[in-house]
Amino acid sequence: MHWMELWKAIILGMVEGLTEFAPVSSTGHMIMVDDLWLKSTEFLGKYAANTFKVVIQLGSILAAVVVFKDRFLDLLGVRGRHPGGHPRLNLIHVIIGLLPAGVLGVLFEDYIDEHLFSTKTVLIGLVLGALLMIAADKFAKKAARTQTVDQITYKQAFFVGLMQCLSLWPGFSRSGSTISGGVLVGMSHRAAADFTFIMAVPIMAGASGLSLLKNWQYVTAADIPFFIAGFFSAFVFALLAIRFFLELINRIRLVPFAVYRIVLAVVIYFLYF
């Protein structure tokens, strides 16, 4: 085991954990940090490196499960119904939100992998996603009628699901597109963020699990320590990032993240081209 390469795995896990759920594009950051600096393909090989990125994403997913564990127990009916008969987020909201991107993702997975994963397309996604986020903040109603995730309607859930389709374009950012969509239909930034993270777990787990099954044969026993280090690094930093972001989003909204995305796109452009 090479300790320097183990540290690279930890750093990549950190980058994944910090950026997966923020509206800044984890793909864009992985391009800048991995492709231009750490180069995981050099010590893992191309296919094992791709599998490694799937594994560290699973670490981020586990962090979201931990943060929202009570909510998931409610959705699954383990904790019983919410007392008082008040409106409550349920599985139908989540399913409605998942369907559009889930269907398109299954139909066009191979096309997206073959034709849309390039530095140029990620740069386009970074900029277009930033413009959407700026527009969402500009045109959002000053007083959001949906303050909490439990007040979300089925129509709002479906619109957020439609907006999630934009995240199939690499670099667009799942949370950037869905939080923007939620804000545009009258949700508070916090309600939109909560729904985004809850909805992200099943769709990310499904996509990552499928990719892992397809590519696991490329992993050797020597790679396992790097995978474990990256997984736990992503888990820890995602845990911190999710909690921090949820406290921050209602205060600063989306524009600062949009500006950051544009700066990131410019930096990647000058480093890569």
Swiss-Prot record:
InterPro entries: UppP. It is a multi-pass membrane protein. One of its GO terms (biological process) is response to antibiotic. One of its GO terms (cellular component) is plasma membrane. Its EC number is 3.6.1.27. Its main location: membrane. The keyword Transmembrane applies. It is found in: Cell membrane. Pfam families: BacA. It comes from the Bacteria. The chain crosses the membrane at residues 4-24, 48-68, 89-109, 116-136, 152-172, 193-213, 222-242, 252-272. One of its GO terms (molecular function) is undecaprenyl-diphosphatase activity. Keywords: Antibiotic resistance, Cell membrane, Cell shape, Cell wall biogenesis/degradation, Hydrolase, Membrane, Peptidoglycan synthesis, Transmembrane, Transmembrane helix. It catalyses: di-trans,octa-cis-undecaprenyl diphosphate + H2O = di-trans,octa-cis-undecaprenyl phosphate + phosphate + H(+). Bacitracin is thought to be involved in the inhibition of peptidoglycan synthesis by sequestering undecaprenyl diphosphate, thereby reducing the pool of lipid carrier available. Catalyzes the dephosphorylation of undecaprenyl diphosphate (UPP). Confers resistance to bacitracin. Belongs to the UppP family. This is Undecaprenyl-diphosphatase.
